[in-house]
Amino acid sequence: MTLNGYLSTDFHIKSPAKKFFQTCIETMDLPKDDVTVEIEEVPLEKKKTTFRIEGFQISEWYKSFKGTITPDMATWQNPDGYKKLEGTMTITHVEDNDCDRAILTVKYEKINSDIKDPGTIMDTFVEFFKEMDEYLVEDFN
């Protein structure tokens, strides 16, 4: 069994991509120096904007969830079983598209082969981001 790996998932967001991304950065207190924004032209004169932050440390921020995880959220998984637990968040917005896309990737290295892949950690992050998205949609309208 390998000790290193990646987990990746994507989900749609309803709130404005830029607002969602800024809220992620603020909520998770992530370093703004690691943020990249790429704007490119897409056929039919639309613009595609990609917001990205790479290599943010998940463990401490995830541990702050422990006391606040609701029954609706994923069960707790101890992040101390990993030497490395880094996240990358990418948000893509295309003009005139009703639904933006978020991609969350977790890169991990387990301390031993008895440790499970961090699937529960990933599920908890996704549930948090979906709840945040719903809040932003309500706040934006």
From Swiss-Prot:
InterPro entries with a match to the protein in the record: Bet_v_I/MLP (IPR000916), MLP-like_ligand-binding (IPR051761), START-like_dom_sf (IPR023393)
Name of the molecule in the record: Uncharacterized protein At1g24010
SUPFAM superfamilies documented for this protein: Bet v1-like
A Gene Ontology biological process term: defense response
Source taxon at top rank: Eukaryota
